[in-house]
């Protein structure tokens, strides 16, 4: 039986590695909710609504995929959405340790929720939202790392800051 999955993240901004995970997951799960977190512990570069709309624009063409913002405990959100799977992406060993710990905690919070991991395509494994923001801040070319709509929005933000 195929289940609905939740792919959570801050997506600040969404990158091509996020899009790769979402695209591949959309062929595995009949419904994939990309959950844009309002993480109060992180100072976001883009406001929540912008992150959500950039993501929606980037994956809107995929069947069975929709973006939803959330600001509560992930396990609670997963259960509210009648999903049973949290999908997480792993780029490197450094991601694994943190994600393994989260998966264990989520399992402890609810036996009804499982965590599954996908790795991105090899040529995307080094991309992170943080690195993209740093490159953009120094006027570097980020077009190979993020969708075109994100490039436009980051350039717009940089231009506003330089005024």
From Swiss-Prot:
Any one GO biological process: coenzyme A biosynthetic process
Reaction(s) catalysed (UniProt annotation): (R)-4'-phosphopantetheine + ATP + H(+) = 3'-dephospho-CoA + diphosphate
Domain of life the protein comes from: Bacteria
Cellular compartments annotated: Cytoplasm
Matches recorded under InterPro entries: Cyt_trans-like (IPR004821), PPAT (IPR001980), Rossmann-like_a/b/a_fold (IPR014729)
Pathway the protein takes part in: Cofactor biosynthesis; coenzyme A biosynthesis; CoA from (R)-pantothenate: step 4/5
Keyword Nucleotide-binding in annotation: yes
This protein's GO CC annotations: cytoplasm
One Pfam family from the record: CTP_transf_like
GO terms, molecular function: ATP binding; pantetheine-phosphate adenylyltransferase activity
Cofactor: Mg(2+)
Leading EC class: transferase
Feature type site, description Transition state stabilizer: 18
Main location: cytoplasm
UniProt keyword list: ATP-binding, Coenzyme A biosynthesis, Cytoplasm, Magnesium, Nucleotide-binding, Nucleotidyltransferase, Transferase
Subunit structure, interactors included: Homohexamer.
Described purpose of this protein according to its UniProt entry: Reversibly transfers an adenylyl group from ATP to 4'-phosphopantetheine, yielding dephospho-CoA (dPCoA) and pyrophosphate.
Family listed: Belongs to the bacterial CoaD family.
Protein name: Phosphopantetheine adenylyltransferase
